[in-house]
């Protein structure tokens, strides 16, 4: 009998949307349903080499500022490494994978926010070759509120320091892509954490039965 393929679930959202607590919740729900914890990843990053690329993207270097196109390519290099060495191997042996960001982030941030959508789509097509999550939960929040939450956690990284209009463009792109793809579920992250987690639980339970029946 052939090995059942695992499932790939991703949590997306702007800064301050509450991804970390949502990931912990989804991790617990998946564990309850399949009897084991999923493999957890983050992007950019998730492998030793990809983590080095993450540092290049996240940490500002005033002596050699990272241009937008290089930022995009570094993120896809890290993503391709993660898919090849972690995500696909796990899925192939029946493990589920829970991702903190994936390709939707690049479409929203580099495509929408940076205005590089043609480049993003071309690189995405070349690197991913149609690979995508089975389910994405997008935590939607107004950028002003999200950045206020992020700032309260401490020093902002290079991406978090972008102008508000960058995040507004990214948010519009997220919502447009969610409108076009039934595998992307929008969660109102401006609510209380309790209500957000309740909504996540409802949506995840609804989709888990379908995903498990497809194994």
From Swiss-Prot:
Keyword Nucleotide-binding: yes
Sequence positions that bind ATP: 13-20
Presence of keyword Transferase: yes
GO biological process: dTDP biosynthetic process; dTTP biosynthetic process; dUDP biosynthetic process
Superkingdom of origin: Bacteria
SUPFAM superfamilies documented for this protein: P-loop containing nucleoside triphosphate hydrolases
InterPro entries linked to this entry: P-loop_NTPase, Thymidylate_kin-like_dom, Thymidylate_kin_CS, Thymidylate_kinase
Gene Ontology molecular functions: ATP binding; dTMP kinase activity
GO cellular component terms listed in the entry, alphabetical order: cytosol
Keywords assigned: ATP-binding, Kinase, Nucleotide biosynthesis, Nucleotide-binding, Transferase
Catalytic activity annotation: dTMP + ATP = dTDP + ADP
Annotated PROSITE patterns: THYMIDYLATE_KINASE
Similarity annotation: Belongs to the thymidylate kinase family.
HAMAP family registered for this protein in UniProt: Thymidylate_kinase (MF_00165)
Job of this protein: Phosphorylation of dTMP to form dTDP in both de novo and salvage pathways of dTTP synthesis.
UniProt-recorded name of the protein: Thymidylate kinase
Organism: Shewanella frigidimarina (strain NCIMB 400)
């Amino acid at each position: 009998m052939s090995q059942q393929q695992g499932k790939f679930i991703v949590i997306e959202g702007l800064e301050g949307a509450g991804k970390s607590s949502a990931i912990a919740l989804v991790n617990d729900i998946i564990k309850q349903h399949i009897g084991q914890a999923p493999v957890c990843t983050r992007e950019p990053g998730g492998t030793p080499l990809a983590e080095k690329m993450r540092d290049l993207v996240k940490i500002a270097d005033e002596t050699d500022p990272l241009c937008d196109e290089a930022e995009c390519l570094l993120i896809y290099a890290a993503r391709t490494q993660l898919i090849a060495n972690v995500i696909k191997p796990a899925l192939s042996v029946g493990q589920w994978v829970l991702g903190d960001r994936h390709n939707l982030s690049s479409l929203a941030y580099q495509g929408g926010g940076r205005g590089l959508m043609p480049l993003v789509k071309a690189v995405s097509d070349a690197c991913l070759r149609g690979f995508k999550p089975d389910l994405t939960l997008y935590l939607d929040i107004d950028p002003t509120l999200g950045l206020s939450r992020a700032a309260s956690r401490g020093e902002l990284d290079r991406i978090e320091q972008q102008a508000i209009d960058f995040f507004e463009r990214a948010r519009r792109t997220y919502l447009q892509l969610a409108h076009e793809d039934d595998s992307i579920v929008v969660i109102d992250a401006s609510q209380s954490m309790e209500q957000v987690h309740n909504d996540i639980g409802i949506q995840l339970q609804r989709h888990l039965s379908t995903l498990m029946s497809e194994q």
